[in-house]
Amino acid sequence: VILGGILSDKWVQKNIKGRVYTSAIGLGLTIPALLLLGFGSSMFNVVGAALCFGIGYGMFDANNMPILCQFVSSKYRATAYGVLNMTGVGCGALVTSLLGKYSDSGTLGDGFALMAGIVLVALLVQISFLRPKVNDFVDE
């Protein structure tokens, strides 16, 4: 998380999309983590997955609120962050149910691969559509 915050703070000084890019790098690191968890069979795979996921998710999560601040006025940030968190919790609940079904059918690796694909789509959407104009959005 600290690495993601520091990198993002420095990068946004040179490029207004620096926070988006830092978050995207972090999100990208979760893809191999999910694949290693789904298909790996050694301690090396588990440790690699843990490192990729820990660093990646930390970089991603450290930038959610700062990115939100680039698009949402301070008047609505608490609401926007609440919606963001609610969506995350809802998706987490769906993933738990989905992975349980994959596990019951003996194809848990396929479930993790599906999640990696969904993360890839989210990554592409993030890079393509998040185009901040300012570092701190203010209503005029």
What residues fall within each predicted segment?
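A late C-terminal transmembrane helix in Major Facilitator Superfamily
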Residues: 1, 71-105
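Interfacial helix-cap and linker-helix signal at transmembrane-aqueous boundaries
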Residues: 7-8, 12, 99-107
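Cytoplasmic membrane-interface "Motif A"-like loop-to-helix N-cap segments
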Residues: 10-26
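A membrane-interface helix-boundary motif in multi-pass transporters
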Residues: 18-21, 101-118
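Small/hydrophobic positions within alpha-helical transmembrane segments
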Residues: 29, 52, 84-91, 121
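Multi-pass alpha-helical transporter architecture, strongest
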Residues: 31-39, 115-140
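Hydrophobic core of transmembrane alpha-helices in multi-pass small-molecule transporters
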Residues: 43-59
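Intracellular juxtamembrane helix-capping segments at the cytosolic ends
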Residues: 59-72
